[in-house]
């Protein structure tokens, strides 16, 4: 997009000595009106009109830019709010997951303690059962021998 105006220089001839004299005489007399030579420093009315139009165009562009900037800021604020809401949800979900992990860890610790307690007991019970089986088998053999012996007699 081309700018509505072109940067250029406006040349003005300034007679500082004359300006100083104007100020001094104005201060002394209380007259702050411009001298007759002042209008010669202003650009011609046609150029002034063009400059005013360009300034008005730039002001419109500035207002449009402000509106677009505000619209973008509102859009970014909305997006930030959405992202913040999503972040809060994810943090809540992460907290729930951490809680579940802690609970599972606690259950695992309890399971390990139970297994640590039960495994030696299981071994003891197996050994005891084996001894009882052996006793029963020995008694059964003894009873069988006694029966055979009594039958043989």
Curated annotation (Swiss-Prot):
Entry coiled-coil feature ranges: 46-109
Top-level taxon of the source organism: Eukaryota
The UniProt record lists the keyword Nucleotide-binding: no
TM region(s), chain numbering: none
InterPro entries found in the cross-reference section: DUF4715
Entry keyword annotation includes Chaperone: no
One GO BP annotation of this record: female gonad development
Pfam families linked to this entry: DUF4715
Keywords: Coiled coil
Listed PANTHER family: COILED-COIL DOMAIN-CONTAINING PROTEIN 182
Name this protein carries in UniProt: Coiled-coil domain-containing protein 182
Gene that this polypeptide is encoded by: CCDC182
């Amino acid at each position: 997009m081309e700018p509505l105006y072109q940067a250029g220089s406006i040349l003005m001839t300034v007679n500082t000595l004359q300006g100083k004299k104007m100020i001094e005489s104005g201060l002394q007399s209380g007259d702050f009106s411009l001298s007759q030579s002042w209008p010669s420093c202003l650009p011609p009315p046609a150029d002034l009109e063009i400059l005013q139009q360009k300034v008005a165009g730039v002001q419109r562009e500035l207002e449009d830019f402000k509106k677009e900037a505000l619209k973008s800021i509102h859009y970014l604020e909305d997006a930030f709010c959405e992202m913040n809401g999503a972040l809060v949800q994810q943090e809540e979900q992460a907290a729930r997951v951490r809680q579940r992990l802690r609970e599972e860890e606690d259950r695992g610790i309890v399971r390990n303690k139970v297994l640590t307690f039960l495994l030696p007991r299981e071994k003891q019970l197996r050994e005891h059962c084996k001894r009882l089986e052996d006793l029963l088998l020995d008694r059964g053999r003894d009873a069988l021998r006694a029966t055979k012996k009594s039958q043989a007699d």
